[in-house]
Amino acid sequence: MLNGGHDDPASIRIRAGALTARIEAGALRTIQAGGIEAVRQVYAAVRDHNWSTIPGELTDIDLEQSDDGVRYAYTSTHRSGDVHFVWHGEIIGSSRDNTLTFIFDGEAKSDFRANRVGFCVLHPGDIAGQPCTILHTDGASEEAGFPADIMPHQPFFDVRAITHETANGARVTVTMEGDTFETEDQRNWTDASFKTYCTPLALPYPRMIAAGTRIRQVVTISAVMPPDAPSVTSDDDDDAQVVMTVTGATVPVPRIGLCVNADGAPITLSEAATLRTLRPAHLRLDLHPAAPDAHARYAQAASQARALDSGLLVALHLTDDADAELGRVADWTHEQDPPLDAWLIFKASSPGTPAALVNKARNVLSRFQVPVGSGTNGYFTELNRHRPDASGLDFVAYSVNPQVHAFDNASLVETLQTQGDTVRSAAAFTGKPVVVSPVTLHIRWNPNATSDDPPTPPGQLPRQVDTRQLSQFGAAWTLGSIKHLAEAGASAITYYELTGWLGVMERETGSPLPALFPSEPGQPYPLFDVLRSVNEFAGGTIRVMRSSAPLRAVGLVLERGGSMRIMLANFINDYVDVRIPGFLETTLEPYAVVIADGQSNG
């Protein structure tokens, strides 16, 4: 399976004078001014009371293009649970004045609670540190800048327009009407962008939207080109050869492990034999000592760690009764004598962990002589906003998933470089080794939910499940994640679970819904081979490698004991020509992972 059924949307290339863009699934993407990306995306979102994005179904599509410009119109219908919202979109491009105008005009067809309905504008993350001008709703302007470091909270409030200059001297202004907008640093969630969104978060949410409520917003992108700007002949370079350059910089291969099955499913002898070949450095157990089955789950995880020759990373979720819970855990540890790797201390259901709780845990657990870390069970956002007192920590930790805001293949790939940025940022403000644990393709839990999600209807996959788990795309994405996290200096990374829909292989019993998740009983998924191939170089080094087109293909170079392994990943549903000067030249098939072994000359 190439992409788990997640096909790339049809893409329409449009031009409005010096501005070029693509229309995909009703959104404007890769808006360039004179061939240089100025705005990554403009799209409209309907998000319910739990921040779940309600997808839209597009109908009544109409496209007109000429030398004078473009007009693209459609209707988008969003229905899920209580939510029923319909809006009409219109994208108008004018070649005469280099403008793209996006109109959102919608009506609620039901009463529902929502956290956001309307436009979001994404500026690319690589303009971090660049100056900009903010026009506020009262007409006042402010000279500002996109933050270089990942900013915990919003850099810009009360926004009507943002103007910045691209590398080729184009002055690009994005004007937003119909609501008050503000900007957040989406790198917190590994999105490679700064998002300017409608409806300030300081206002109470969720808000009730009554049937019949109309919402209209307009976003206009305009560009003033320098007099000597060259004419645009192409809006991208999709067919160019990707050149990868091996640098002299090196980092250690991180210790890569897996999570035990969250549903408590055991592993069979045959599954254990297969998993042992992956050589996981650790197994992560999320242990809630107050839960009735905590003792049994601890014993099971200890047994699995021994069976796989792995260490046990115990993530303790402690409540206000932490003294009693730590006492029980200490007793169970003496009883089980597991191959401990480390302790990870969390305050249960909290975005951060108080230093006093970490110190209390260290006092009880230090007798077992393994590292004690903390941070957050949530995203880097929570770590950044609730920065721990790292003086009593051996490492800091946070989790990653690429689908907090967007769900298409291209957006998932865009998160990969930003994953590395979060590691560098966490290391900078804590001064401690960084453990990224776990990395999953989809959300495990929502730290910002205002209520529980409804149960999964019969015959449907749970929200946490993504069919790209068993796809070639999933393998390529996993290699990209390892590359960027490792090259940024992550000391350890936890990926996925052992078996099943969220694991690295299917269970012997097979998929409970084979029509929706078409795996083969007992078979490893393609991402299994990626993890195994990297772990075969455990204790070695990684030579940092740069790609000329990191959203199309990247590579990872591993070395140990005179041996070298080059692993290449193709992120797109097309063939990609790759050249590594002095090493190899090849063509990658769609979503392929290619491995080449040789001798190290370093």
Label every model-predicted segment.
Residues C259-P292, Q304-L313, Q336:
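Catalytic domains of carbohydrate-active enzymes, especially glycoside hydrolases
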Residues Y43, T77-G81, T163-Q241:
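Beta-strand-rich recognition/accessory modules
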Residues M1-T77, P280, R284, H295:
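Acidic-aromatic substrate-binding/catalytic surfaces of carbohydrate-active enzymes
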Residues S349-Q472:
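Noncatalytic carbohydrate-binding groove/subsite architecture in carbohydrate-active enzymes
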Residues T99-E177:
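Polysaccharide-binding surfaces and accessory modules of carbohydrate-active proteins
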Residues G212, S437-P526:
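Aromatic/acidic polysaccharide-binding cleft in carbohydrate-active enzymes
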Residues S547-P581:
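Carbohydrate-binding surface patches
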Residues D48-G106, E184-Q186, T190-S193:
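Extended, loop-rich substrate-binding clefts of extracytoplasmic carbohydrate-active enzymes
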